[in-house]
Protein backbone atom coordinates (compact mmCIF):
# COMPACT_ATOMS: atom_id res chain seq x y z
CA UNK A 1 0.00 0.00 0.00
CA UNK A 2 2.93 2.35 0.62
CA UNK A 3 3.94 2.04 -3.03
CA UNK A 4 0.43 3.07 -4.04
CA UNK A 5 -0.25 5.87 -1.55
CA UNK A 6 3.18 6.99 -0.26
CA UNK A 7 1.51 7.44 3.12
CA UNK A 8 3.96 7.08 6.01
CA UNK A 9 1.40 5.17 8.05
CA UNK A 10 1.75 2.15 5.76
CA UNK A 11 5.55 2.27 5.93
CA UNK A 12 5.43 2.54 9.70
CA UNK A 13 3.03 -0.40 9.88
CA UNK A 14 5.39 -2.68 7.96
CA UNK A 15 8.41 -1.68 10.05
CA UNK A 16 6.43 -2.11 13.27
CA UNK A 17 5.23 -5.56 12.24
CA UNK A 18 8.76 -6.71 11.43
CA UNK A 19 10.08 -5.26 14.68
CA UNK A 20 7.35 -7.01 16.65
CA UNK A 21 8.47 -10.33 15.20
CA UNK A 22 12.09 -9.85 16.26
CA UNK A 23 13.54 -12.74 18.24
CA UNK A 24 17.12 -13.82 19.08
CA UNK A 25 16.87 -16.83 16.81
CA UNK A 26 15.67 -14.74 13.86
CA UNK A 27 12.31 -14.49 12.13
CA UNK A 28 12.84 -15.76 8.60
CA UNK A 29 10.99 -18.98 9.28
CA UNK A 30 8.09 -17.18 10.99
CA UNK A 31 7.28 -14.67 8.28
CA UNK A 32 5.05 -16.01 5.47
CA UNK A 33 7.07 -16.59 2.31
CA UNK A 34 4.90 -14.21 0.29
CA UNK A 35 5.88 -11.42 2.71
CA UNK A 36 9.65 -11.91 2.62
CA UNK A 37 10.01 -8.97 0.23
CA UNK A 38 9.13 -6.74 3.19
CA UNK A 39 12.75 -7.19 4.27
CA UNK A 40 13.96 -5.39 1.14
CA UNK A 41 11.48 -2.59 1.80
CA UNK A 42 12.55 -2.28 5.43
CA UNK A 43 16.24 -2.23 4.51
CA UNK A 44 15.70 0.47 1.89
CA UNK A 45 13.61 2.60 4.22
CA UNK A 46 15.71 2.31 7.38
CA UNK A 47 19.21 1.27 6.34
CA UNK A 48 19.16 -1.16 9.27
CA UNK A 49 21.63 -3.92 8.39
CA UNK A 50 19.71 -6.44 10.47
CA UNK A 51 17.23 -6.62 7.59
CA UNK A 52 20.04 -7.48 5.20
CA UNK A 53 20.88 -10.40 7.48
CA UNK A 54 17.24 -11.50 7.35
CA UNK A 55 17.45 -11.42 3.56
CA UNK A 56 20.59 -13.55 3.61
CA UNK A 57 18.93 -15.97 6.03
CA UNK A 58 16.01 -16.46 3.64
CA UNK A 59 18.41 -17.09 0.78
CA UNK A 60 19.80 -20.07 2.69
CA UNK A 61 16.49 -21.85 2.13
CA UNK A 62 17.50 -25.25 0.71
CA UNK A 63 14.57 -25.61 -1.70
CA UNK A 64 13.22 -23.04 -4.13
CA UNK A 65 9.45 -22.85 -4.54
CA UNK A 66 7.26 -20.69 -6.78
CA UNK A 67 6.14 -18.79 -3.69
CA UNK A 68 9.75 -17.76 -3.08
CA UNK A 69 10.45 -16.67 -6.66
CA UNK A 70 9.55 -12.97 -6.29
CA UNK A 71 11.91 -12.67 -3.33
CA UNK A 72 14.69 -14.67 -4.99
CA UNK A 73 14.34 -12.65 -8.19
CA UNK A 74 14.55 -9.38 -6.26
CA UNK A 75 17.71 -10.65 -4.55
CA UNK A 76 19.22 -11.81 -7.83
CA UNK A 77 18.44 -8.49 -9.51
CA UNK A 78 19.79 -6.35 -6.67
CA UNK A 79 22.81 -8.35 -5.54
CA UNK A 80 23.74 -11.11 -7.99
CA UNK A 81 23.84 -9.36 -11.37
CA UNK A 82 20.83 -11.39 -12.55
CA UNK A 83 22.94 -14.52 -12.89
CA UNK A 84 20.16 -16.93 -11.88
CA UNK A 85 17.44 -15.70 -14.25
CA UNK A 86 17.56 -18.92 -16.26
CA UNK A 87 16.93 -21.03 -13.16
CA UNK A 88 14.15 -18.69 -12.06
CA UNK A 89 12.48 -18.87 -15.46
CA UNK A 90 12.83 -22.66 -15.44
CA UNK A 91 10.76 -22.87 -12.25
CA UNK A 92 7.79 -21.52 -14.20
CA UNK A 93 8.73 -23.03 -17.55
CA UNK A 94 8.55 -26.54 -16.11
CA UNK A 95 5.22 -25.99 -14.36
CA UNK A 96 2.40 -28.02 -15.90
CA UNK A 97 -0.61 -26.40 -14.25
CA UNK A 98 -0.93 -23.00 -12.62
CA UNK A 99 -3.14 -22.14 -9.67
CA UNK A 100 -4.26 -18.61 -8.96
CA UNK A 101 -1.48 -18.25 -6.40
CA UNK A 102 1.04 -19.48 -8.97
CA UNK A 103 -0.19 -16.70 -11.27
CA UNK A 104 0.38 -14.16 -8.49
CA UNK A 105 3.90 -15.50 -7.95
CA UNK A 106 4.57 -15.24 -11.68
CA UNK A 107 3.53 -11.60 -12.07
CA UNK A 108 5.33 -10.64 -8.84
CA UNK A 109 8.45 -12.36 -10.18
CA UNK A 110 8.23 -10.54 -13.50
CA UNK A 111 7.89 -7.27 -11.58
CA UNK A 112 11.27 -7.94 -9.94
CA UNK A 113 13.09 -8.77 -13.19
CA UNK A 114 15.22 -6.41 -15.20
CA UNK A 115 14.36 -6.10 -18.87
CA UNK A 116 18.09 -5.90 -19.53
CA UNK A 117 18.07 -9.70 -19.60
CA UNK A 118 15.25 -9.59 -22.09
CA UNK A 119 15.26 -13.26 -23.08
CA UNK A 120 14.00 -14.41 -19.69
CA UNK A 121 11.83 -11.39 -19.04
CA UNK A 122 10.07 -11.95 -22.36
CA UNK A 123 9.71 -15.68 -21.72
CA UNK A 124 7.91 -15.14 -18.43
CA UNK A 125 5.89 -12.24 -19.81
CA UNK A 126 4.66 -14.38 -22.71
CA UNK A 127 3.91 -17.27 -20.36
CA UNK A 128 1.91 -15.00 -18.09
CA UNK A 129 -0.14 -13.70 -21.00
CA UNK A 130 -1.04 -17.23 -22.09
CA UNK A 131 -2.01 -18.34 -18.58
CA UNK A 132 -4.04 -15.28 -17.68
CA UNK A 133 -6.08 -15.53 -20.88
CA UNK A 134 -7.03 -19.08 -19.91
CA UNK A 135 -7.88 -18.04 -16.36
CA UNK A 136 -10.06 -15.19 -17.58
CA UNK A 137 -12.32 -17.62 -19.41
CA UNK A 138 -13.68 -18.69 -16.03
CA UNK A 139 -14.65 -15.20 -14.90
CA UNK A 140 -16.83 -14.12 -13.19
CA UNK A 141 -17.45 -17.47 -11.51
CA UNK A 142 -13.86 -18.48 -10.87
CA UNK A 143 -12.86 -19.36 -7.30
CA UNK A 144 -9.57 -17.65 -8.16
CA UNK A 145 -11.13 -14.27 -8.95
CA UNK A 146 -9.00 -12.49 -6.34
CA UNK A 147 -5.73 -13.85 -7.69
CA UNK A 148 -6.73 -13.22 -11.30
CA UNK A 149 -7.82 -9.66 -10.56
CA UNK A 150 -4.64 -8.79 -8.72
CA UNK A 151 -2.49 -10.31 -11.45
CA UNK A 152 -4.31 -8.44 -14.22
CA UNK A 153 -4.12 -5.06 -12.48
CA UNK A 154 -0.45 -5.46 -11.63
CA UNK A 155 0.33 -6.67 -15.16
CA UNK A 156 -1.37 -3.57 -16.56
CA UNK A 157 0.57 -1.35 -14.16
CA UNK A 158 3.98 -2.75 -15.13
CA UNK A 159 3.32 -2.97 -18.87
CA UNK A 160 2.93 -6.73 -19.18
CA UNK A 161 -0.69 -6.36 -20.33
CA UNK A 162 -2.26 -3.55 -22.33
CA UNK A 163 -4.48 -1.38 -20.13
CA UNK A 164 -6.83 -0.65 -22.97
CA UNK A 165 -7.49 -4.35 -23.51
CA UNK A 166 -7.36 -5.79 -19.99
CA UNK A 167 -7.96 -2.91 -17.61
CA UNK A 168 -11.72 -3.41 -17.63
CA UNK A 169 -11.28 -6.95 -16.28
CA UNK A 170 -9.25 -5.62 -13.38
CA UNK A 171 -11.89 -2.98 -12.71
CA UNK A 172 -14.56 -5.68 -12.81
CA UNK A 173 -12.76 -7.72 -10.17
CA UNK A 174 -12.25 -4.63 -8.02
CA UNK A 175 -15.98 -3.93 -8.07
CA UNK A 176 -16.79 -7.58 -7.40
CA UNK A 177 -14.60 -8.03 -4.32
CA UNK A 178 -16.43 -5.31 -2.42
CA UNK A 179 -18.83 -8.00 -1.28
CA UNK A 180 -16.20 -10.57 -0.27
CA UNK A 181 -15.63 -11.17 3.43
CA UNK A 182 -12.32 -9.56 4.41
CA UNK A 183 -11.51 -12.57 6.59
CA UNK A 184 -11.29 -14.79 3.50
CA UNK A 185 -8.95 -12.57 1.50
CA UNK A 186 -5.64 -13.38 3.21
CA UNK A 187 -4.21 -9.99 2.23
CA UNK A 188 -5.20 -10.21 -1.42
CA UNK A 189 -7.90 -7.56 -1.09
CA UNK A 190 -5.33 -5.03 0.16
CA UNK A 191 -2.97 -6.08 -2.63
CA UNK A 192 -5.69 -5.53 -5.23
CA UNK A 193 -6.58 -2.21 -3.62
CA UNK A 194 -2.98 -1.03 -3.94
CA UNK A 195 -2.78 -2.06 -7.60
CA UNK A 196 -6.14 -0.41 -8.29
CA UNK A 197 -4.89 2.86 -6.81
CA UNK A 198 -1.74 2.70 -8.95
CA UNK A 199 -3.84 1.82 -12.01
CA UNK A 200 -6.05 4.88 -11.55
CA UNK A 201 -3.10 7.18 -10.89
CA UNK A 202 -1.54 6.11 -14.17
CA UNK A 203 -4.80 6.83 -15.95
CA UNK A 204 -4.75 10.49 -14.86
Regions found by a protein language model. Give the residues of each.
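Extended ligand-binding clefts on enzyme/binding-domain cores
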Residues: 63-69, 73-149, 161, 165-184, ...
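Asp-box/WD-like beta-propeller blade repeats and closely related beta-sheet repeat scaffolds
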Residues: 49-70
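CBM-like carbohydrate-recognition segments
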Residues: 1-20, 24-54, 140-204
Amino acid sequence: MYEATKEDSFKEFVIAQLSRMEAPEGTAERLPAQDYSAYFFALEQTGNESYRQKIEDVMKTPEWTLELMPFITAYDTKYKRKEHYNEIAAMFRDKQQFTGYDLVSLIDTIAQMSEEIYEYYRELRDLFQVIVKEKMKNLPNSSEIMEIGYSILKACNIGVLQKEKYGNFGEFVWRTIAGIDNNTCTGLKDMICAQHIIFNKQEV
